[in-house]
């Protein structure tokens, strides 16, 4: 079966599989994307958008998160200051982490880049956001 998955996204999937991620190709509105799972890290999507490759994590918001408290937004501002790769924000019902992945793939540079991504995952998953997530 021939895939329409972006070749760079395919390379990233192969690399992430080596790091313990399970990649599943899914059909999006306009083109396929990857959905990735890991035992210790959040599930996320890798997709293309306007020629860029992006990684997106979605978490549902709890009733406290949906209320949009000053405490939550203060914490999000703090996390955005500390995060090295992700932009962290909310929409109507989700907390979203989003970053652009370099299109030029090399094993060494992507490995270093991904260690920054996993550092941001740990930062966000440290428990402080717990009351705001469903």
Task: State what each model feature region is.
Residues 5, 9, 65-69, 110:
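Generic alpha-helical secondary structure
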Residues 37-66:
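Long, continuous compositionally biased terminal/linker segments
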Residues 18, 125-134:
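Charge-rich, low-complexity terminal tails
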Residues 85-113, 126-130:
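Well-ordered alpha/beta subsegment
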Residues 1-43, 81-90:
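Charge-rich, low-complexity N-terminal segments
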Residues 113-121:
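Short amphipathic C-terminal alpha-helix that caps PH/PH-like domains
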Residues 30-34, 53, 95:
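Hydrophobic residues embedded in beta-strands of well-ordered beta-sheets
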Residues 56-96:
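Short, internal acidic amphipathic alpha-helical interface segments
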